[in-house]
Amino acid sequence: MVVEADKKALICSFCSKKQHEVKKLIAGPAVFICDECIDLCTDIMKEENKVALKQITSSIPTPQKICGILNDYVVGQDQAKKILAVAVYNHYKRLEYIQSGNNDVELNKSNILLIGPTGSGKTVLAQTLAKILDVPFTMADATSLTEAGYVGEDVENILLRLLIASEFNIAKAQKGIIYIDEVDKIARKSENPSITRDVSGEGVQQALLKIMEGTVASVPPQGGRKHPQQDFVQLDTSNILFICGGAFMGIDSIITSRTNHSSIGFAANVNIDKEKNNSEILKSLEIEDLTKFGLIPEFIGRLPIVTTLDELDKEALITILTKPKNAIVKQYQKQFELDDAELVIDDSALETIAEKALAKKTGARGLRSILEHLLLDSMYKVAELKKQRVTITKEVVNGLVEPIMTSLISTKSNKKQPIIADIPA
């Protein structure tokens, strides 16, 4: 509200200028602000945005360097790493270009869709990218999301998590990365548009469209539903990179059905090409397959970069156990080291662990649960015993024997001292 009356009595609460000295004086609850202070605040916020962006773009590595760092943490998936490295590099270079003000060509945002089996590395790829770039990062599970007004989590809560990750630094949050997992679980129930309300499927896809494309969203800083009277934070999502991931179980059948020209009728066997594994089939993925699976065309359009991840074989799982910087075995060895103990897992045991993970079809994610089960009793005991070596063999993995525990204390201390007899002169 612009205050007209008693111009001499009213002053700006920030610069103390009287109303007749400024063009506009806006009244709030017991405070006033003039147009000059508003302009100053706007300039300060713009400058902060520039500084936050400069910190990110000045240190962004090249695609080859990004790929090299990903290699330290993620085994295999070379094509997916290359696509991600280029996409992320181009995304942040786009932000630098926009900030420069030289906008003769409009560069659109390119969000990413990762498709691959459980435990193939989708989540760790997104997490590692955020670490490389040192930008705010958050993860969300699509299965917990519902359309606004229904029981469940609103899509705006994803943005709240990003704000929390950035310590409520709006400028930093607006340059962050959001990873939405299990996005295949929000596919609509049928290929045709639903007549009834699909609040956890198509409804969620519709709700995600705006924030993925770019909008100024009103984010409730205390969560949306428990505090309806709170003030909202305005967050521009135009420059937030969205990475979506999912296993898309059954999409291989849709692809095979489309590519297999010998199939006749809807009841035809789509598993004729048995020599091909899922990874090879996924490489033939087309947009129409995603539509048939249950993603609406508008949602797919917000994810222009689609890449598939390979199913991990036995050799890859063994490598994951031992080679990366954050290898699972290295993590457990460090845990034992903190208790003055030593963990040894022989090669035959590593092979058996990998075989068990393959049989369970849980990929790399299953390796940790197998090791946790194997080492539970040992971790329970070594904290008390100290100075122990725990050895895991193939027989231990197969449940035939218990983990072998031996003392690390030098055997010298256990040796009896020789008795020196008195020799008469």
Curated annotation (Swiss-Prot):
The keyword Lyase does not apply. Coiled coil: none annotated. InterPro entries: AAA+_ATPase, ATP-dep_Clp_protease_ClpX, ATPase_AAA_core, Clp_ATPase_C, Clp_protease_ATP-bd_su_ClpX, ClpX_bact, P-loop_NTPase, Znf_CppX_C4. The keyword DNA damage does not apply. SMART domains: AAA (SM00382), ClpB_D2-small (SM01086), zf-C4_ClpX (SM00994). Zn(2+) binds at C12, C15, C34, C37. GO terms for cellular component: HslUV protease complex. It comes from the Bacteria. Residues 1-53 form the ClpX-type ZB domain. It holds the Pfam family AAA_2. One of its GO terms (biological process) is proteolysis involved in protein catabolic process. GO terms for molecular function: ATP binding; ATP hydrolysis activity; ATP-dependent protein folding chaperone; protein dimerization activity; unfolded protein binding; zinc ion binding. Keywords: ATP-binding, Chaperone, Metal-binding, Nucleotide-binding, Zinc. ATP binds at P117, T118, G119, S120, G121, K122, T123, V124. SUPFAM superfamilies: Glucocorticoid receptor-like (DNA-binding domain), P-loop containing nucleoside triphosphate hydrolases. Component of the ClpX-ClpP complex. Forms a hexameric ring that, in the presence of ATP, binds to fourteen ClpP subunits assembled into a disk-like structure with a central cavity, resembling the structure of eukaryotic proteasomes. Belongs to the ClpX chaperone family. ATP-dependent specificity component of the Clp protease. It directs the protease to specific substrates. Can perform chaperone functions in the absence of ClpP. This is ATP-dependent Clp protease ATP-binding subunit ClpX. It comes from Rickettsia rickettsii (strain Sheila Smith).
